[in-house]
């Protein structure tokens, strides 16, 4: 098949690698004008991979993919298939009609639930035990096209948003691997989306405020939020680490665990109250118990050593955070 990839970030790199591994004729690669992205390793650059493979590259702001000059450039490539992992905008009808087979996309949720452009952390944030990804056909809507296939990575206790992201992208690569022969043969499924299951959202749009810790939540929920938003401090992740406020400044919590502190020791303490320093961190009261924050930094010291913040908190027991 003649394939045009419109892609970005690690998911775009993995999709391009799989297309090449399967011997597809990648006739063009459309990448972001920001690629390679500041703060991301070279392994997440679609442009660098395309250049190494000597593929034709068109570098544009990806939200301009529907512009007439871009459409003309893609049309000249005469693609059978457009593969677009995580598009930045819905495709216009003119773009959708260019490839003879169609346009396909990865969406990081178990469609039909959680449509939208910022859903990568949706399943882990909700507390699900699996992080789903859907390969689907594109139409003019936002994640409303027929489903081709779905898969999931199990969320382990030690997973963070950073690690589950990578695990899920590998699942996505496997979905593409299985789909390519079906696409060549004209046998790829087009499963119409069912109504959204009761209790699950139609769409999910990440808000920066979601990163703020609610200390009235359970210890399990607080730790889950911390782990969902945890990532290497030098990595340009899609959101900040989980945070609370301390002395009118943001205090980022990068790692935490549930505490087995005796309930009698925290009786009378309010949620968010700093309890005491432990061997590996700071105990903090939650809605139903306590957690130990084991890696924290103050706002201006995100890239620095966490010990300064831990020591500062330890000297201010019983400070109330938030």
For the regions a protein language model found, what residue spans apply to each?
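One-carbon transfer enzymes
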Residues: 1-237, 249, 278-292, 297-322
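Low-complexity, polar-biased intrinsically disordered regions enriched in Pro/Ser/Thr/Gly
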Residues: 232-239, 263-269
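Short, structured protein-protein interaction patches enriched in aromatics and acidic/basic residues
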Residues: 237-255
């Amino acid at each position: 098949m003649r394939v045009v990839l419109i892609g970005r970030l690690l998911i775009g790199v993995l999709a391009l690698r799989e297309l090449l591994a399967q011997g597809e004729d990648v006739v063009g690669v459309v990448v972001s004008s920001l690629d390679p992205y500041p703060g991301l390793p070279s392994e997440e650059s679609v442009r660098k991979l395309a250049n190494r493979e000597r593929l034709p590259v068109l570098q544009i702001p990806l939200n301009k993919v529907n512009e007439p000059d871009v459409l003309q450039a893609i049309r000249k490539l005469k693609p059978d298939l457009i593969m677009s992992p995580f598009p930045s905008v819905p495709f216009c009808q003119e773009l959708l009609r260019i490839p003879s087979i169609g346009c396909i996309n990865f969406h990081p949720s178990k469609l039909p639930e959680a449509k939208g452009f910022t859903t990568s952390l949706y399943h882990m944030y909700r507390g699900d035990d699996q992080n789903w990804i859907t390969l689907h056909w594109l139409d003019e809507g936002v994640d409303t096209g027929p489903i081709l296939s779905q898969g999931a990575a199990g969320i382990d206790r030690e997973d963070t948003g950073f690690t589950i992201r990578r695990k899920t992208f590998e699942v996505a690569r496997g979905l593409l691997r299985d789909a390519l022969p079906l696409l060549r043969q004209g046998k790829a499924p087009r499963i119409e989306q069912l109504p959204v299951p009761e209790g699950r959202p139609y769409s999910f749009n990440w808000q920066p405020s979601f990163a703020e810790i609610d200390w009235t939540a359970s210890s399990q929920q607080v730790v889950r939020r911390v782990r969902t938003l945890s990532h290497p401090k030098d990595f340009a992740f899609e959101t900040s680490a989980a945070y609370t406020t301390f002395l009118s400044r943001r205090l980022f919590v990068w790692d935490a665990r549930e505490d087995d502190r005796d309930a009698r020791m925290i009786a009378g303490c309010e949620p968010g109250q700093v309890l005491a320093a432990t061997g590996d961190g700071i105990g903090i009261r939650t809605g139903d118990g306590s957690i130990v924050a084991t890696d924290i930094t103050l706002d201006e010291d995100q890239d620095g050593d966490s010990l300064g913040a831990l020591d500062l908190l330890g000297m201010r027991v019983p400070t109330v955070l938030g």
